[in-house]
Amino acid sequence: MVLAAITLKVGAYGFLRFILPILPDASRYFAPAIIVLSLIAVIYIGMVALVQTDMKKLVAYSSISHMGFVTLGLFLFSGGYLNDWALQGAIIQMISHGFVSAAMFMCIGVMYDRLHTRNIADYGGVVNVMPKFAAFMMLFGMANAGLPATSGFVGEFMVIMGAVEVNFWVGALAALTLIYGASYTLWMYKRVVFGPITNPA
């Protein structure tokens, strides 16, 4: 939880607080390359998360994909574009991701304590045993998926809007992660919480 909530943000905070103000010319020069790398991270890691069978690995890969949004937003701002949408979206995404990913890892930890496995196929029917927990996990699962009216949506949407202002195709590629995020998070939630009971424990 500490890794997801705090440590992952150190690099992005370092960019925002030190690298961008101290080395503005270098930031502007390398911005196109970092924007491309961020898009690769957002899309490719989202695809990797889709095939995970381990809950913890799935949430970990989704965290990497979300942090790709943060670097994308930061360098859309610093690359000479001065895009406020992207910068504000990156900051909101950092804050949101800190709470959401920590909560998701906590949910996985609670389930692991009961069955001592993180394999998605070993779970099912959690809502019948722990309905309040299922509601809690649904709330943060929706935010992790980036569904509207959640904090996860606000940051990603602002970065995408900023990207569209700079280049339509950058924004379109970044928007793919909303599809991936909804796919892997909701699939995991449906299987674990509403799926058939495979283990009565």
Where are these regions (language model features)?
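Hydrophobic transmembrane alpha-helices and their helix-loop junctions in integral membrane proteins
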Residues: 1-196
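Short, intrinsically disordered, charge-balanced linker/junction segments flanking boundaries
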Residues: 198-201
